[in-house]
Amino acid sequence: MFINRWLFSTNHKDIGTLYMIFGAWAGMVGTGLSILIRAELGQPGSLLGDDQIYNVVVTAHAFVMIFFMVMPIMIGGFGNWLVPLMIGAPDMAFPRMNNMSFWLLPPSFFLLLASSMVEAGAGTGWTVYPPLAGNLAHAGASVDLTIFSLHLAGVSSILGAINFITTIINMKPPAITQYQTPLFVWSVMITAVLLLLSLPVLAAGITMLLTDRNLNTTFFDPAGGGDPILYQHLFWFFGHPEVYILILPGFGMISHIVTYYSGKKEPFGYMGMVWAMMSIGFLGFIVWAHHMFTVGMDVDTRAYFTSATMIIAIPTGVKVFSWLATLHGGNIKWSPAMLWALGFIFLFTIGGLTGIVLSNSSLDIVLHDTYYVVAHFHYVLSMGAVFAIMGGFVHWFPLFTGYTLNDTWAKIHFTIMFVGVNMTFFPQHFLGLAGMPRRYSDYPDAYTTWNTISSMGSFISLTAVILMVFMIWEAFASKRVVKSVSLTSTNLEWIHGCPPPFHTFEEPAFIKSSH
């Protein structure tokens, strides 16, 4: 019974739950690694050892947070749980493939951890650039294990993407068009398209790196007519869409949360929101070289990538102002989920502004590989993606479990987290402007003050993570059941009660034509 339900599951709700639990545990690992980083940087001098072990920790922190925390929770967890419920489908289009997508992740995670355990570990940064990732600078199996880990995670995501695209296009009730599906469904579909188009390029790049390392090919070795810059193009053609993959489902969740707690029946500017997401998805593929402004590209190339990158601010602005317009005139309920959503809008916008700064190729020459870049992407990830996950979690927790979280604890948790992440990452803008480089385990004494404050902030965030564990325990221990949910007419996922039955929509949903 237990094995049939959890190991061989074909139920989108159970698989979504598995993704959530896996992502939560991976998030603990990623948090631990981030605490190691900030402990090392809390004061000048050495704590862990040399830069190799430090860079192994930094690399693992990135991979764990991206591939095993944010993506499994947002796409695998929320996506699996909510998409079929929101479109009135009985399950995903390919339920067994769905199960395989999940079970590819634990082996992938194991391979990543194994890469740290053998030889000296993969101290390459998450970009895995050759020649540092070649078989001279990184002799041994570490980088190879990392590459295999990425292959498995990539296959998992590609299969998941195929599944979501098929489900969303094919399993709606015949009466409704794509433009009547909720924004979260749209966000997952666009994310899936991005995954489907970008991951094969990453797979090609890291496979070439694998053969360069082991089979004596020279794709990225100038001695044999190769070019390490080719690797950078291949990696970033995946890497830039990837950062939009990490944030787009968050956009979808924030739209739902803001609409719900503003007491509105629909988000402001639905079509504008959809087109904005599609524009972001398209533009995300044609700006990749802004990560490479320092490798010596032609001035006209730099001009193009600068302007193209700035254009992405327009659809992003459409989304931000539409969220504000949704709030406008609403009967606002200051629930914990709403606090996360408001925090998201504010902090994501700050991250977007520093992104506009970095898009200037001339400025980026100075700021590239400094802590300014670290501050920028942690504002959009640690306060964008993670805030969206937390908001979605506290909003849909009653749907997933049937129990309610304690409102007061949830608000305290938000406050601690808000203070912690801002104290961690705001000072890093100053460090970057002062020229402190990334990926070094030590620094000149001049940078001590802001680094110490930053490290203190990370420990505040750690207490927030611990409080969250307590909060979830408290909810399950207290067993406060959900009586009823308001606004189900425009929030289809809630109509089956909390939690919904094992099988939902066994008959096709009936859609009234008046809507």
Curated annotation (Swiss-Prot):
List of residues binding Mg(2+): H368, D369
The entry's keywords: Calcium, Copper, Electron transport, Heme, Iron, Magnesium, Membrane, Metal-binding, Mitochondrion, Mitochondrion inner membrane, Respiratory chain, Sodium, Translocase, Transmembrane, Transmembrane helix, Transport
Mitochondrial intermembrane compartment segments: 41-50, 118-140, 213-227, 287-298, 358-370, 434-446
Binding residues annotated for Fe(II)-heme a, in chain numbering: H61, H378
Binding positions for Cu cation per the UniProt entry: H240, H290, H291
Record: residues binding Na(+): E40, G45, S441
Localization terms from the record: Mitochondrion inner membrane
Gene3D superfamilies for this protein: Cytochrome c oxidase-like, subunit I domain
Membrane topology label: Multi-pass membrane protein
SUPFAM superfamilies, A to Z: Cytochrome c oxidase subunit I-like
1'-histidyl-3'-tyrosine (His-Tyr) crosslink location in chain: H240-Y244
Binding site for O2: Y244
Pathway where this protein functions: Energy metabolism; oxidative phosphorylation
Major place of residence: mitochondrion
Catalytic activity as recorded in UniProt: 4 Fe(II)-[cytochrome c] + O2 + 8 H(+)(in) = 4 Fe(III)-[cytochrome c] + 2 H2O + 4 H(+)(out)
GO cellular component terms given for this protein: mitochondrial inner membrane; respiratory chain complex IV
Enzyme Commission code(s) on record: 7.1.1.9
GO molecular function, one term: heme binding
Pfam family, one: COX1
Mitochondrial matrix side: 1-11, 87-94, 171-182, 262-269, 328-335, 401-406, 479-515
Cofactor: heme; Cu cation
Function of the molecule: Component of the cytochrome c oxidase, the last enzyme in the mitochondrial electron transport chain which drives oxidative phosphorylation. The respiratory chain contains 3 multisubunit complexes succinate dehydrogenase (complex II, CII), ubiquinol-cytochrome c oxidoreductase (cytochrome b-c1 complex, complex III, CIII) and cytochrome c oxidase (complex IV, CIV), that cooperate to transfer electrons derived from NADH and succinate to molecular oxygen, creating an electrochemical gradient over the inner membrane that drives transmembrane transport and the ATP synthase.
Quaternary structure and interacting proteins, as annotated: Component of the cytochrome c oxidase (complex IV, CIV), a multisubunit enzyme composed of 14 subunits. The complex is composed of a catalytic core of 3 subunits MT-CO1, MT-CO2 and MT-CO3, encoded in the mitochondrial DNA, and 11 supernumerary subunits COX4I, COX5A, COX5B, COX6A, COX6B, COX6C, COX7A, COX7B, COX7C, COX8 and NDUFA4, which are encoded in the nuclear genome.
Protein name: Cytochrome c oxidase subunit 1
The species this protein was found in: Heterogeomys hispidus
